[in-house]
Regions:
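Short beta-strand immediately N-terminal to the catalytic nucleophile in serine-hydrolase-like folds
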Residues: 3-5, 28
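Short, conserved loop/helix-junction motifs that constitute active-site signature segments
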Residues: 20, 43-50
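Gly/Ala-rich beta-loop-alpha elbow adjacent to hydrolase catalytic centers
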Residues: 5-13
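Acidic beta-to-alpha connecting loop that harbors the catalytic carboxylate
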Residues: 59-61, 78-81
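Catalytic histidine-centered segment of alpha/beta-hydrolase-like enzymes
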Residues: 80-92
Length: 108
């Protein structure tokens, strides 16, 4: 099982990955902090997944961009906002490449 979500759904996916037995989490537009309040970081939620996590955020996301960490890969799409809507195929390609590289998954 690979679970994921966008924005607050990405937070839920990270917080519930352990309970669901997810092999990995895809976190699109993870809201690192409320806009203008970097002191209210939610970075700890990413590590709650306790599995591989891919975060795809836009370079212009007002919710911030998390740092890479062990088991947490961060892809930043240039010019994208929190919506990730300018070039969705770029986010799809990044997610597909990451999924293809995860050991233990069955690929069609």
């Amino acid at each position: 099982l690979v679970q994921g979500g966008r924005s607050n759904g990405a937070r839920v996916a990270c917080r519930t990955a352990c309970a669901t037995g997810a092999r990995a989490v895809l976190a699109l537009a993870f809201p690192l902090h409320p806009p203008g309040h970097p002191e209210k970081s939610r970075a700890g939620e990413l590590s709650l997944a306790r599995t591989d996590v891919l975060v795809i955020n836009g370079s212009r996301d007002p919710f911030g961009i998390p740092d890479q960490a062990p088991r947490i890969r961060v892809v930043v799409l240039d010019g994208e906002t929190h919506a990730l809507s300018r070039r969705p195929e770029t986010a799809g390609a990044a997610a597909g490449a990451w999924l293809a590289g995860l050991p233990g998954l069955i690929h069609p």
